[in-house]
Amino acid sequence: MASQGTKRSYEQMETGGERQDATEIRASVGRMIGGIGRFYIQMCTELKLSDYEGRLIQNSITIERMVLSAFDERRNKYLEEHPSAGKDPKKTGGPIYRRIDGKWMRELILYDKEEIRRIWRQANNGEDATAGLTHIMIWHSNLNDATYQRTRALVRTGMDPRMCSLMQGSTLPRRSGAAGAAVKGVGTIVMELIRMIKRGINDRNFWRGENGRRTRIAYERMCNILKGKFQTAAQRAMMDQVRESRNPGNAEIEDLIFLARSALILRGSVAHKSCLPACVYGLAVASGHDFEREGYSLVGIDPFKLLQNSQVFSLIRPNENPAHKSQLVWMACHSAAFEDLRVSGFIRGKRVVPRGKLSTRGVQIASNENVEAMDSSTLELRSRYWAIRTRSGGNTNQQKASAGQISVQPTFSVQRNLPFERATVMAAFVGNTEGRTSDMRTEIIRMMESAKPEDLSFQGRGVFELSDEKATNPIVPSFDMNNEGSYFFGDNAEEYDN
């Protein structure tokens, strides 16, 4: 397991590879990206999409969802065993948007899953290329993170909606493997564990028998993944307690919520990777770029360079602001939903506004919306600088934060102070230091109280000019310490509903 001391880079998790050197990793990630690009080109040919239609992000998402659905073995099996009226378990499809006589039209397409699997394997040298599928899942997850809030889900599990910065990857399917686990926030895993424990409380047989044994293994594995994200001994020791509990119940739920809260100040390590829509990879492959030969990294300059010269379009609803739609997709591309807006804005070279001030809804368009009334516009996905993505939470300190989000989860490895509001976070920690984890709780609270506002995280780390591919001259930005830094401030986003 990636969490047990064998530190593999994201790229190794991403490509399922064992330890490799940097060149091999770049090549295998490149192979994965090239496969996605080739698949996309082939699908555009099958669907007879024009160049313009192939660059439409809504078409890209439909094609991506089709291949994910075609390879979702569990769900496919379930659909075959529980046939529902009007749904063919062997087919997958979605809306494709075409430009006809100066208007956008929606066409619902249907394909055999078997056919989609064949096209995907053919694009990936005959292999299943699970890594590429996971990569697409992470792109969808990053898009959801930037688009929706998870207030309801947080409240349902007894957590505070202001803890949204811990919820990265909360819509990732379970089958997303080690690469998926790496990008999940502390709150996401806490929520999964709490759901398990609640089922165990309500269902006597949940932990029993052969199935229960498997459940128990999954529970302990998830505990280990979460433990691996924490950076302090006391937090890890508390996770050991939760993992070793004979019969997990309310005490464990309490401990997990305590740990999630503590992660607002003593942040966990959460990986960030730039995962782009399939059409971007398709465009690059079509223009002759050989990803495997050139190599590719999800955490370096490569995604920035790719976005610098890709033109992607999006459908825009009548009252939406195209610049805001671009910001949403830019944030999703760089997994920056929970990043400090000061940092994102500096790198992007444009002011980045909080979610509540965006005049845009999600990228996907519901089946009952009138497409003919919509126009399309170019998404501005370019950046002024680039920065290395981080896999750590940065060390921690505080600053006045906002009503909507009381902490950040850094995406870019750039020197700054990390905003959170100590008063708000600490208010949740009154009393309740009794019980078997009391000494650990006391220690965690002590560490949180000593976190200082002026402390800089990622010291000396900066952003780079796009011409500086080898990252030789870091530019360390200076930020206004008192500026509003959180994206979900004063939020009015839609809830995420499956």
UniProtKB/Swiss-Prot annotation:
Region feature (Disordered): 1-22
Motif (Unconventional nuclear localization signal): 1-18
GO CC, alphabetical: helical viral capsid; host cell; host cell nucleus; ribonucleoprotein complex; viral nucleocapsid
Predominant cellular place of this UniProt entry's protein: virion
Organism domain of life: Viruses
Family the entry assigns: Belongs to the influenza viruses nucleoprotein family.
Full protein name: Nucleoprotein
Species this protein is from: Influenza A virus (strain A/Swine/Wisconsin/1/1957 H1N1)
